[in-house]
Amino acid sequence: MKKCLHILPMNKLSGAEKMALLICKNMKKFTPVVVCGGKNLSEIFKKEGIESYDTTFSNKNIFKTLRFLKNIIEKNNIKIIHAHDNNASLNAYLVKRTFRLDIKV
């Protein structure tokens, strides 16, 4: 089954994160994988049985974040990235362009 990566740069369960959790729990054609902005949010997704990773989204260390995302994409054979805010969209676009990945953003 194809995998979809959800990028959530925050570390708390608020509006967009709740919506992402609902989307992930109800996905039928894709297996969700989530990258969160911290352990707290990552643990919530793991409790729901959703594969989840955590990292720090920082403009100072953006290349570290991009390498982390690239490794997750390659490790899990991700085909689609769903970004849930502006920061996530920028990171998704940059990881695709920087590493020339064949993914849909």
Describe these PLM feature segments.
Residues 4, 99-105:
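Active-site proximal beta-strand in glycosyltransferases
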Residues 45, 92-96:
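Hydrophobic packing residues within well-ordered alpha-helices of enzyme cores
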Residues 79-80, 104:
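Short, Asp-centered acidic motifs that coordinate Mg2+ and/or phosphate
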